[in-house]
Regions:
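Residues at or immediately preceding the N-termini of alpha-helices
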Residues: 103, 136-139, 151
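Conserved acidic donor-binding segment of nucleotide-sugar-dependent glycosyltransferases
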Residues: 131-136, 148
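Nucleotide-sugar donor-binding catalytic core of glycosyltransferases
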Residues: 1-129, 161-188
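Short, charged, surface-exposed secondary-structure boundary motifs
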Residues: 124-125, 140-146
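Catalytic phosphate/metal-binding cores of nucleic-acid and nucleotide-processing enzymes, i.e., regions
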Residues: 78, 139, 158
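Conserved donor-nucleotide binding/catalytic region of nucleotide-linked donor-dependent transferases
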Residues: 144-161
């Protein structure tokens, strides 16, 4: 299970969920690859430090321990994140019809997203190839329920989501150009009818 967390001072729900999930990472029993961006490294704020203390962990929550496979992401190269079967993908906000590279990067690498964000994501992708969460507590609980068989059971839906994600991974200018050309062609057909 992989995860990339950055620290922004923006007070958006998704940023707060990412920080909370990062702080609670030691509750995940399955192997993890948690990283912090070198551009915006995770720093503990007072709320996070208090949450960590309440969990009674003995170590400094920000210790960069090899035992936890927790490092600054080398050269901010995301490829390492998607060598895992599952990736925690938390959008900055939860809005209908909005999803970002946080989801697409996982789908295009056939990595199952443990996803929070777009409420109607099922309109775009097969949610049977995703793990949908509502809170950081869900993240921890569902990460602990993942077994070696989970990925294989989801494989047909992972493959379907990969095919769908390829369309969104294409450059926007290409998609816009094709849509304009399609509309022009449709308009010409109507005029010639």
């Amino acid at each position: 299970i992989s995860f990339l967390c950055t620290f922004h001072s923006r007070d958006l729900e998704g940023y707060n969920k990412r920080k909370d999930a990062f702080v609670k990472r030691l509750l995940i029993k399955n192997p993890t690859l948690f990283y912090s961006s070198t551009r915006y490294p995770v720093r503990m704020d007072i709320k996070s430090m208090e949450m960590y203390r309440q969990m009674n962990f003995q170590r400094d929550p920000m210790s960069w321990s090899a035992d936890d496979a927790m490092f600054l992401l080398p050269k901010d190269d995301k490829a390492k994140l998607f060598s895992s079967q599952f990736h925690i993908s938390i959008e900055s906000t939860s809005v209908d019809n909005y999803f970002s590279e946080k989801l697409i990067d996982a789908l295009i690498t056939k990595t199952v997203p443990i996803y929070w964000g777009c409420p109607n994501i099922g309109d775009f992708f097969d949610i049977r190839g995703m793990i949908i969460v509502d809170s950081e507590s869900d993240i921890i609980e569902l990460c602990n329920q993942i077994t070696p068989e989970t990925y294989e059971q989801m494989k047909p839906y992972i493959d379907e989501n990969y095919e769908r994600a390829k369309e969104y991974a294409r450059p926007l200018r290409d998609r816009v150009k094709e849509e304009i050309e399609k509309k022009i062609k449709e308009s010409n057909v109507k005029q010639n009818s």
